[in-house]
């Protein structure tokens, strides 16, 4: 009977562990991208799309573009604010506005 407490990753070679780590990181990045797309869609779609047709009209396209850009701007601002609170001295030292 197999030992349930044994870590199977420990049996991998160093190169296999590195490959597994890179694969997991890649999958996590895909999940983050999918989450961002879901957030963009749930935030911007109701604001910008009236009737569903074969393609977006110019105003819908522009609205979606502006909405996503504002969404990204807000998220960047929040991340920057958090980073400044957490690592402010480092950001100031590196020359970012503080």
Curated annotation (Swiss-Prot):
Pfam families named among the record's database cross-references: zf-Tim10_DDP
Primary site of residence: mitochondrion
Coiled-coil region list: none
One GO location term (cellular component): mitochondrial inner membrane
Motif stretch (Twin CX3C motif): 44-67
A single GO molecular function term of this UniProt record: protein transporter activity
Record-level GO BP terms: protein insertion into mitochondrial inner membrane
Keyword Transcription: no
Disulfide bonds: 44-67, 48-63
Function: Mitochondrial intermembrane chaperone that participates in the import and insertion of some multi-pass transmembrane proteins into the mitochondrial inner membrane. Also required for the transfer of beta-barrel precursors from the TOM complex to the sorting and assembly machinery (SAM complex) of the outer membrane. Acts as a chaperone-like protein that protects the hydrophobic precursors from aggregation and guide them through the mitochondrial intermembrane space.
Complex and partners: Heterohexamer; composed of 3 copies of TIM8 and 3 copies of TIM13, named soluble 70 kDa complex. Associates with the TIM22 complex, whose core is composed of TIM22 and TIM54. Interacts with the transmembrane regions of multi-pass transmembrane proteins in transit.
Domain notes: The twin CX3C motif contains 4 conserved Cys residues that form 2 disulfide bonds in the mitochondrial intermembrane space. However, during the transit of TIM8 from cytoplasm into mitochondrion, the Cys residues probably coordinate zinc, thereby preventing folding and allowing its transfer across mitochondrial outer membrane.
The protein's name: Mitochondrial import inner membrane translocase subunit tim8
């Amino acid at each position: 009977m197999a030992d349930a407490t044994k870590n199977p990753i420990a049996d991998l070679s160093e190169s296999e562990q590195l490959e597994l780590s890179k694969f997991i990181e890649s999958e996590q990045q895909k999940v983050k991208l999918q989450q961002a797309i879901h957030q963009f869609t749930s935030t911007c779609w109701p604001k910008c799309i009236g009737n569903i047709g074969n393609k977006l009209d110019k105003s819908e396209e522009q609205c979606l573009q502006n909405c996503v850009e504002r969404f990204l701007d807000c998220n960047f601002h929040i991340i920057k604010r958090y980073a400044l609170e957490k690592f402010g001295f480092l950001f100031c030292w590196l020359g970012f506005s503080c």
